[in-house]
């Protein structure tokens, strides 16, 4: 926030674009409602309007019911079973999995057979969170390399991959060629 405030105060013109504006009730925390830094809202378009105009695609939600954990079963094992089952059912080459926490992603890839099950099906995988950084097929990479690879794989019709991301609706991520979320 201090960097944004600095550039905003020292620029002749400054514009901010976001699909998910963040607001704060206090001036100590960053919030796009702080007009001294961000200015007034010039234009705000609701997502349904953008969908109707054909500018963005509507979300297609496919619901899978979660079963109750078995005695002594780890949540990550159940998540693995459900995610692999969903990938098998939707039969798409490019899949985005949205997790509720970084811990959930880390548990899924480190404590279960998820990664080996993906490999068995011909999928690569990638993840990025603010806590862990970026990773592609188990190798730590820079953010730049992550997004370059994401775009490259997204344009490659033959590439099968899964992106694991935390809080996708609040952060946002753009995946070329994405077929299923």
Predicted regions and their residues:
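Conserved helicase ATPase core of P-loop NTP-dependent helicases/translocases
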Residues: 122-170
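SF2 helicase motor core recognition
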Residues: 54, 162-181
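Switch/connector loops and helix/strand junctions flanking conserved nucleotide-binding motifs
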Residues: 23-28, 135-136, 173-174
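Short glycine-/polar-rich loops that comprise or flank the Walker A/P-loop
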Residues: 10-13, 38-40, 56-60, 121-124, ...
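Post-DEXD/H (motif II) to motif III coupling segment of the RecA-like Helicase ATP-binding lobe
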Residues: 2-56
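Conserved helicase motor "Helicase C" RecA-like lobe of SF1/SF2 P-loop NTPases
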Residues: 102-129
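Short hydrophobic segments within beta-strands
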Residues: 17, 96-98, 128
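Conserved interdomain linker/interface between the two RecA-like ATPase lobes of SF2 helicase motors
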Residues: 39-106, 111
């Amino acid at each position: 926030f201090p960097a944004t405030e600095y550039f905003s105060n020292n620029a002749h013109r400054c514009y901010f674009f976001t699909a998910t504006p963040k607001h704060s009730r206090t001036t100590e925390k960053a919030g796009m409602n702080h007009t001294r830094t961000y200015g007034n809202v010039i234009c705000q378009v609701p997502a349904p309007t953008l969908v109707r105009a054909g500018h963005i695609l509507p979300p297609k939600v496919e619901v899978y019911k979660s079963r109750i954990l078995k005695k002594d079963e780890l949540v990550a094992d159940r998540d693995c079973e459900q995610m692999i089952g969903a990938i098998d059912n939707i039969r798409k080459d490019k899949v985005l999995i949205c997790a509720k926490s970084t811990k959930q992603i880390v548990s899924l890839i480190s404590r279960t057979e998820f990664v080996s099950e993906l490999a068995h099906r011909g999928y690569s995988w990638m993840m990025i969170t603010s806590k862990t950084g970026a990773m592609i097929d188990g190798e730590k990479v820079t953010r730049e390399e992550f997004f370059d690879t994401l775009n490259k794989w997204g344009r490659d019709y033959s590439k099968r991959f899964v992106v694991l991301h935390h809080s996708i609706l609040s952060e946002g991520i753009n995946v070329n060629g994405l077929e299923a979320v």
